[in-house]
């Protein structure tokens, strides 16, 4: 019986007020996407395994939901939208060289370990900007991230921005083995400065290179940190990455959003497809980033189209948690009306409901049961987000009940 009424571990039902809030937020975010000129795209919930395979550098195989079709092909529930969008763009926009702006919403599925306490199905909304490798494109994506956070109702948040090219250039110069490199990435990701220093001390590096790599976990702060980082290395590729971040910051200032920007040169990702800037949006009330994104100029080539790209995704569950814990209310009005009627006035009730629906009102017809009283319907209405009740007592006697104030007024038909 438990399996009939309960959901599996890692997934949950969303209903009533929570569902209303979630849909409101999704519509707010979608308006931001459209305001910046992005067009909607839908991709399948499942794809061939190769779309998310190791070569793409997305979710580890053990965390994928895999199954077989009747022809024996291995299929995967999408864990990440970006490879799906890259595949679709490579198919439908192969010859397009002008910028392509796409936006999406839907569920993603990651079979994470139970002890991590994460949902295995989450709702993601995001954008992808293809065929544009400019700093302006990077800044546009950052500005959209800020706008999404603001329009969701958040005011106290920050966008942490890094550049994978900075660390990558230093690591390549140091010629670190893959094992050491992976361990160093892990230490930097958790800001373990001392662990990174101990590991690097065993690598027989030049003093300046040792110091630069050692300090990566501590290179976070405002725009001044970029100049500090530049003073640590003469590596051309590393300095180019820093210059790119500085240029992006100047454009973000044109948007008026610089106060939300924070630089973190130790920001790394488990997704290997990132090639340029990488960023995450944080606020109070959730341990996970609400928004994650970055530049992935080589990913589309895996699907046959050589094109630069940048994008981000918003994790709706993290956003909802943050709003709830910060006690931020959303301006959602209870606009539904309950049209309550006795059974002998059903034709009149249907006629009135249709008239009001044609005017754009949300009207639910409810027949007054003989074993109920008016107070039962008032309680039912409040629980189910009705704004008011129109109660047809007789063909010439109608009451309007405001469920927020309790005010009752007679009205004429």
Model-based region annotation:
Residues 1-83, 139, 160:
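TRNA-binding/sensing appendages of the translation machinery
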Residues 21-32, 47-48, 82-93, 102-154, ...:
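Positively charged, Gly/Ser-enriched RNA/tRNA-binding surfaces
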Residues 52-53, 168, 190, 319, ...:
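Short Asp/Glu-rich motifs
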Residues 63-69, 176-197, 205, 257:
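Acidic, His- and aromatic-enriched active-site or binding-groove loops in soluble protein domains
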Residues 97-98:
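Phosphate/dinucleotide-binding and metal-coordinating scaffold of catalytic cores
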Residues 120-125, 161-169:
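Short, conserved phosphate-binding/catalytic loop or strand-edge motifs used
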Residues 144-151, 165-175:
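Hydrophobic mid-domain F-helix/FG-region of cytochrome P450s
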Residues 156-165, 184, 262-266:
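Short, surface-exposed recognition loops or helix-turn segments adjacent to catalytic cores
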């Amino acid at each position: 019986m438990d399996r009939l009424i309960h959901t599996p571990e890692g997934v949950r039902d969303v209903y009533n007020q929570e569902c209303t809030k979630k849909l409101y937020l999704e519509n707010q975010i979608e308006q931001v996407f459209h305001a910046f000129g992005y067009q909607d795209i839908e991709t399948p919930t499942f794809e061939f395994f190769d779309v998310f395979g190791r070569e793409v550098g997305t979710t580890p195989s053990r965390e994928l939901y895999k199954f077989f079709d009747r022809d024996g092909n291995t299929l995967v529930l999408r864990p990440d939208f970006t490879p799906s969008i890259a595949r679709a763009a490579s198919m439908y926009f192969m010859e397009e060289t002008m910028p392509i702006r796409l936006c999406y919403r839907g569920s993603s599925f990651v079979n994470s370990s139970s002890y991590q306490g994460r949902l295995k199905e989450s709702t993601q909304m995001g954008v992808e900007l293809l065929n544009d490798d400019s700093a302006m494109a990077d800044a546009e994506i950052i500005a959209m991230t800020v706008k999404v956070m603001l329009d969701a109702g958040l005011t106290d948040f920050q966008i942490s921005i890094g550049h994978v090219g900075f660390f990558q250039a230093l690591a390549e110069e140091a010629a670190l083995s893959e094992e050491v490199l992976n361990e160093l990435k892990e230490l930097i990701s958790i800001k373990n400065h001392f662990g990174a220093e101990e590991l690097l001390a065993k690598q027989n590096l030049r003093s300046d290179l040792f110091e630069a790599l050692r300090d990566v976990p501590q290179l976070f702060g405002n725009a001044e940190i970029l100049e500090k980082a530049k003073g640590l290395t003469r590596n051309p590729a590393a300095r180019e990455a820093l210059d790119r971040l500085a240029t992006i910051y100047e454009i973000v200032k044109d948007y008026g959003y610089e106060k939300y920007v924070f630089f973190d040169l130790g920001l790394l990702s488990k997704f290997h497809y990132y090639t340029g800037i990488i960023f995450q949006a944080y606020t109070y009330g959730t341990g996970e980033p609400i928004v994650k994104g970055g530049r992935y100029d080589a990913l589309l080539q895996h699907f046959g189209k050589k094109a630069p790209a940048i994008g981000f995704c918003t994790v709706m569950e993290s956003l909802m948690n943050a709003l709830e814990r910060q006690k931020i209310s959303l301006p959602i009005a209870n606009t539904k009306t309950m049209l309550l009627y006795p059974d002998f006035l059903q034709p009149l009730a249907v006629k009135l409901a249709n008239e009001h629906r044609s005017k754009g009102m949300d009207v639910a017809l409810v027949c007054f049961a003989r074993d109920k009283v008016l107070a039962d319907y008032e309680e039912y209405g409040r629980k189910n987000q009705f704004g008011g009740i129109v109660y047809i007592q007789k063909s010439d006697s109608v009451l309007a009940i405001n469920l927020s104030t309790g005010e009752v007024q007679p009205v004429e038909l």
